[in-house]
């Protein structure tokens, strides 16, 4: 067993240091950015804020609201194909992600959703434990199946696993285990990592 005894930080531990600016008002700040990705030729422009793929936040209703502001929603994986069919016309494909799990049924559902609108660029592969070896293999399989999609994978919290997922074909890695306000992973399982340090370290992968 190895114990890490250096200081790790959460967002509550830090403040943003002010600095000189040429802006007169916060309303002048432009949040939109242009993005390119490692494994696909797809590009994206918008505000890089994602609503998570939880069943309470990654909803069609959330997506309709956030797309007006060029923000993204990872639609949760519990919707059926029929529910997708009923809502697909209300969704801007630039600002949503399909979410799937690891099973063959998930893979097939992903294919069928993209058949409804192949302009959807994002595919989120979501599992409870991103540290399993079979998850890395699943990311490789999804990359081979959807070579032009922007693939998101997670969750993990450390640099070495972030690197493994990127090498397997992920363009974006979801960072964080247990930081959510209602998440019980840390209190029940004792597993996690202070979120700010986790993001900082994983960004070097």
Residue ranges and their predicted role:
Residues 1-205:
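Active-site entrance/lid segments in N-terminal catalytic domains of soluble metabolic enzymes
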């Amino acid at each position: 067993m190895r114990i890490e005894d250096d200081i790790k930080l959460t967002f509550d531990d830090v403040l943003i240091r002010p600095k000189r600016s040429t802006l007169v008002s916060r309303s002048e700040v432009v949040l939109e950015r242009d993005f390119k990705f490692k494994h696909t030729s797809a590009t994206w422009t918008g505000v890089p804020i994602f609503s998570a793929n939880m069943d309470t936040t990654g909803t069609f209703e959330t997506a309709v609201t956030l797309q007006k502001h060029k923000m993204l929603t990872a639609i949760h994986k519990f919707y059926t194909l029929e529910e997708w069919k009923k809502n697909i016309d209300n969704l801007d494909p630039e600002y949503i992600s399909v979410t799937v799990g690891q099973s063959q049924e998930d893979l097939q559902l992903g294919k069928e959703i993209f058949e409804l609108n192949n302009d959807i660029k994002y595919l989120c592969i979501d599992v409870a434990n991103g540290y399993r070896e079979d998850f890395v293999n699943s990311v490789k399989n999804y990359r081979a199946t959807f070579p032009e999609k922007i693939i998101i994978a997670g969750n993990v919290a450390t640099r070495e696993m972030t690197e493994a997922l990127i090498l397997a074909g992920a363009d974006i890695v979801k960072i964080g285990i247990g930081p959510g306000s209602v998440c019980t992973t840390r209190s029940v399982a004792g597993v996690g990592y202070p979120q700010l340090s986790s993001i900082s370290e994983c960004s070097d992968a």
